[in-house]
Amino acid sequence: MLNMAVGPTSVLTGATMGAMEQAPGMAAVQGRLMRECLNVAHAWGVALPDDIDERLSRGSGVPGHKPSMLQDFEAGRSMEIDPIVTTVLELARRRRVPVPTIETLWALTALKERVARAD
């Protein structure tokens, strides 16, 4: 869940873990992403701990760290959008779980990758 929330948001913002943790409103956005992911897991009968705040605070130990998705983007490599975001989106659709924040994140991140590759 954490990777799905921090990877794409770091690509969209260019921010490190520490910068995202300090940014007003970012914890709320990432928390919504993780909540939606948790709802999808529950819809499939997967019991995951509801420890979103604890998971989000893990970035405080590595403030200068760039998530792997941002590292891939900056290096011009293909990002892991499909296994990290698209899969959750497809699972949500199959169970008709509303995931508006994940849908928005997917559209923005996929577009950013297409635009970068076009350059």
Describe every region a protein language model picked out.
Residues 1-21, 25-38, 64:
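Active-site-proximal catalytic alpha-helix in oxidoreductases
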Residues 27-119:
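NAD(P)-dependent Rossmann-like dehydrogenase/reductase catalytic/cofactor-binding core
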